[in-house]
């Protein structure tokens, strides 16, 4: 009998903070299932979800502006603990009779809050003791408004010099507000505070672990699929790979994986995928060698968005053709993950909403009438990786840098040709190999090589050469929304450049991209 890993659950109401998904990931790290819903969720939806506790997120909005979002009134009458974070604390204060005002001195960044009263939320949690004998917490603030008056029956738990109510609490109703962000790592005791709320105050059990998620997924997959057959597009990326391993464990040979080699993959990648999933793990794989078909479709096309659409269209056509040959197949599996679901709902409604099936099948023919299987749709990317490790996939594969869906199709600038792809593959492999050798690969967030369709004069021995240019790109980022170019050592860059020019016949010059995001994007196309 498997445990009900959804038995205890936290509802996070999203007011639009850039940290909201991070907040959800922290709750999951603690071992408790949670979902992100829009702030204007209905009472009926909350009752149906039946949360053990509710967290109100931060927001870029101001609570003192007309029309700014508010939590549903039912949040405060549902009888469950509530934690308001930053904006969430401010809307809690206003809705329960307190006051919020614009702060003369805004707080962005590090702050130290002084504990003024005992509270179940932070009891025995501290970073230091100040000269006055008060416990203090090192926290991360990001607010322009502040609570000026707390509601009746609340007490001041902590404050700063400029923020009189950094933590407020109503212990009887188990309502808590924190003006800082416990979900970010800069708040040193943030995870302990969230643990105290989720496990201690809400009474949740830590049932959400990699092992229990796998066990639960296998049971649910077997119930959903029965004795039917499933087809999956296997790319070798993290999401499709973990989906394949979960399904293989659940239904074995009744899973057919279609691997489309589009000629736009990294060096030896197709062989590695086939060897790992076919030879090592024994999955049933249909290998579609389609380099010529993709390159023919891309001939003469140099506009990035047009290239992306062509690559997507040809993939769908090929996948359709193979799927139609599998007459016994009744289900299509996809590696949809929870951020895809949130993004899909946000694009449809303008905000994140209750979890719904995320159909990104694209152009699959209607006559296929396949059911949809999405075993990862409740999981964040970091959870998917941990599950992959538990299922036996290698660390290096699960934690390698992101690779775009269109592959080298958007790393060869302009028209895509086989010659360009072959040169780029070899140059990129040298760059990545040297990053590993120098122990730099895991110190940058993403690194790759770009092929530039321009020729440059070079000298080799006594001869003159006129060959192609490539650019190295390496960035450091937390969320890929913004990024800094990585300050790689000069001697390292020199070594990579020398190897590429000497070993890859056809490349005469190597440059290094020192553009941040913004203004540049991480990928060139």
UniProtKB/Swiss-Prot annotation:
Entry's EC annotation: 6.3.5.2
Catalytic activity field: XMP + L-glutamine + ATP + H2O = GMP + L-glutamate + AMP + diphosphate + 2 H(+)
Pathway: Purine metabolism; GMP biosynthesis; GMP from XMP (L-Gln route): step 1/1
The keyword Nucleotide-binding is annotated on this UniProt entry: yes
Location of the Glutamine amidotransferase type-1 domain: 9-207
Source organism, top-level taxon: Bacteria
PROSITE patterns tied to this protein: GATASE_TYPE_1, GMPS_ATP_PPASE
Any one GO cellular component localisation term in the record: cytosol
Keyword annotations from UniProtKB, A to Z: ATP-binding, Glutamine amidotransferase, GMP biosynthesis, Ligase, Nucleotide-binding, Purine biosynthesis
Domain GMPS ATP-PPase residue range list: 208-400
GO molecular function annotations of the record: ATP binding; GMP synthase activity
UniProt KW Transit peptide keyword: no
Binding site for ATP: 235-241
Catalytic residues identified in the record: 86 (nucleophile), 181, 183
Pfam families from the UniProt entry: GATase (PF00117), GMP_synt_C (PF00958), NAD_synthase (PF02540)
Role according to the record: Catalyzes the synthesis of GMP from XMP.
Oligomeric form and interacting partners: Homodimer.
The protein's name in its UniProt record: GMP synthase [glutamine-hydrolyzing]
Protein's organism: Yersinia pseudotuberculosis serotype O:3 (strain YPIII)
Gene that this polypeptide is encoded by: guaA
